[in-house]
Amino acid sequence: MQSDDEILDRIRGTLVQLFQLEPADVTPAARLYEDLEIDSIDVVDLMDEVQRHTGQKVTPEDFRSVRTVGDLVAVMQRLLRA
């Protein structure tokens, strides 16, 4: 099983690659919409990346409560345990 730090590193790399963000801006407390300016279309791309990484089907319900990078780490941990 991957640690939260390993998942955070993976998410950081994905966000930097997909959305040209600064790595230092991608912290567990960073809010996806407000701080990182990720919009609803970007979330679809992000869901696809999570699905690819976890091997689990990702639904909109999985992302309903995701507001921060830390929330995304928690979702990925849950999917990896499934």
Name these PLM-found stretches.
Residues 1-24, 77-82:
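Thiotemplate assembly-line natural product biosynthesis machinery
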Residues 24, 34, 61-64:
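Pre-signature/interface helix of ABC/ABC-like ATPase nucleotide-binding domains
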Residues 29-36:
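N-terminal helix-turn-helix DNA-binding core of bacterial DNA-binding proteins
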Residues 42:
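Two-component histidine kinase catalytic core, primarily the HATPase_c
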